[in-house]
Amino acid sequence: MTTPDAYSLEIKEKMHMNIKKIGLIAILSLMVCSAWAVPARKDGMLITQPDGSQIMVYQHGDEHFHWMTNDNGEWLKMDPDGFYRVTEALSTEAIETKRMASPRRVIYKETPLNIAPRGLVILVNFQDLTFTTSKEEMDSMLMGEHYTRDYTYTYRGKSYHITSEGSARQYFNDASFGQYNPQLDVIGPVMVKSNMKYYGANNLSGNDKAPETMIKEACELVNDSVDFSQYDNNEDGFVDFVYVIYAGYGEADGGGDNTIWPHAWNLYSAAGQKCEVDGKIIDLYACGNEMDNYTKYHTGIGTFCHEFSHVLGLPDLYETTGNGTHKTMGEWSILDYGPYSNDGNTPPTYSAYERFFMGWFKPRVLT
């Protein structure tokens, strides 16, 4: 395995101090900023209108504010009759105002890092939608030692052959130079009380209505068969995290307005929902979808690794204004557009910054 020394950076003292400042800013931002969410997938989607006609649409933004455009770059909105029609575009300033008004703008964390050695993953069914992927396959994708995928799908008349190697656990082992090998216990699926629309439908502001309720119900449903106290690794009275994979598609990759946008948030300290199990409070959670809207196969590890990186304490790094003026790492960063690389099956590993942030890498300073 490659050693940290092979990746050491020789940088000047001033650069080292700047990196430390950037890291501090990111840490502080975790205490007063939004729920973290995977960005919208940018590939075009063919939408069938109520009259049978089809249009190509492109999704932009993230959980806090997102919008659709057509091939000409014009903004679209879905009217009450179900038709997508051209509407007035918002300015960059208006987009940021909408994002700041999101009810999930506040997240509270007592500590910046959460390197939990063990965590719970709950598979969730809805009353109108259930898992098509086996629990064994999901467990292998997250924890398998020699996990591989090999499949072919057709999209817009063209066939794509996908191959990949490595589970989510292997991803974090590699990203940490072997210093972090999370134990992810997969349970379920369990069925929550309502249809997906109840939790995932967008409100007037464009935000999902009640995904936190799904989290609370899922934890209560597995309480009889799970000892949640074993997931409070630092014994602070809070379960370190809970991750939910819900049946069906997600909104970020075009699943529709009634589906849930993958994200990480705080159930108790931000959403205000108290869920106490085995004497422990559920707070930090993350969630993602089972199925990929483009391939029609189950998702790869990309979205999981993105959202789980938020569980560990890392922030989003993607551009949010939609005008392309802010240059970011794009597909080269797991915290940007990287979760979608190779259709979500081969996300990029952590950069030197993320490894430094997590304490897995120490730059060498030139004197």
List the predicted regions and their residue ranges.
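Short, Lys/Arg-enriched N-terminal segments with co-localized hydrophobic residues
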Residues: 4-16
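Short stretches within intrinsically disordered, low-complexity N-terminal or propeptide regions
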Residues: 5-8, 28, 37
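Zymogen propeptides/activation segments of proteases
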Residues: 12-13, 22, 36-283
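Sec-dependent signal peptide hydrophobic core
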Residues: 20-27
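Hydrophobic alpha-helical context, especially transmembrane and signal-peptide helices
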Residues: 28, 43, 227-228, 327, ...
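Extracellular hydrolytic enzyme modules, especially secreted metalloproteases
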Residues: 241-243, 247-367
